[in-house]
Amino acid sequence: MLDPIAIQLGPLAIRWYALCIVTGLILAVYLTMKEAPRKKIIPDDILDFILVAFPLAILGARLYYVIFRFDYYSQNLGEIFAIWNGGLAIYGGLITGALVLYIFADRKLINTWDFLDIAAPSVMIAQSLGRWGNFFNQEAYGATVDNLDYLPGFIRDQMYIEGSYRQPTFLYESLWNLLGFALILIFRRKWKSLRRGHITAFYLIWYGFGRMVIEGMRTDSLMFFGLRVSQWLSVVLIGLGIMIVIYQNRKKAPYYITEEEN
């Protein structure tokens, strides 16, 4: 088992979980700022947004996690704020971040679709890296399996939990998000019929579908009417993504690649 603490500085413990999240954030900010001028968005506005959105998204992710495990946390109130032990729900962070983005874009007079489109691939790569925090914490894993011989030894050993090998669902989602990120980079450079909002829609559909499938492998999620709560939210994301494509096509939204860039 790998030590979840990366660096120990006296009483201060810096955990791999935090490093994975922060690394993903830094890379996401860099990529978003790099693409921002293409959509006539000031890069400094991206930094201003992150300073507001990131802490609120962390709070939203934790609140979502605590709410759906309230039976436990109502008896362990002191652990509600112990985010260093894990327990950040991505959907809670996404919902909070989207709300903050909408308000921020409105106040800065930035087109919300443009902001979402340049942020979507960055969010995907941040999620891909962030999932490795679950790996170090030995959480968000799947059902038991006979062996994991197809995986590198360090992953196989870390996924040996409570006397059994577990499906490395963190890895599946990380790779799925990485592939989605790569596809978006290709689409937004090569697909000339890509309209404003289409990248956001692709993110919602791609992530929603992958999460719905992978979530079915997990054993630690809350069930609701035969599906896990996260799977229901995945269905919502997929439906929302499809609606965005239809809506933007019908209103003939501007193309992502402008005539000046062709």
UniProtKB/Swiss-Prot annotation:
Biological-process GO terms, alphabetical: lipoprotein biosynthetic process
UniProt pathway: Protein modification; lipoprotein biosynthesis (diacylglyceryl transfer)
Enzyme class: transferase
PROSITE patterns listed in its UniProt record: LGT (PS01311)
One example GO MF annotation: phosphatidylglycerol-prolipoprotein diacylglyceryl transferase activity
Binding site for a 1,2-diacyl-sn-glycero-3-phospho-(1'-sn-glycerol): 131
Topology in membrane: Multi-pass membrane protein
Record-level GO cellular component terms: plasma membrane
Principal cellular location given in the protein's record: membrane
UniProt keyword list: Cell membrane, Membrane, Transferase, Transmembrane, Transmembrane helix
Known EC number: 2.5.1.145
The keyword rRNA-binding belongs to this UniProt entry's keyword annotation: no
Pfam family, one: LGT
Transmembrane segments: 9-29, 41-61, 80-100, 109-129, 167-187, 197-217, 226-246
Family under the similarity heading: Belongs to the Lgt family.
Name this protein carries in UniProt: Phosphatidylglycerol--prolipoprotein diacylglyceryl transferase
Gene expressing this chain: lgt
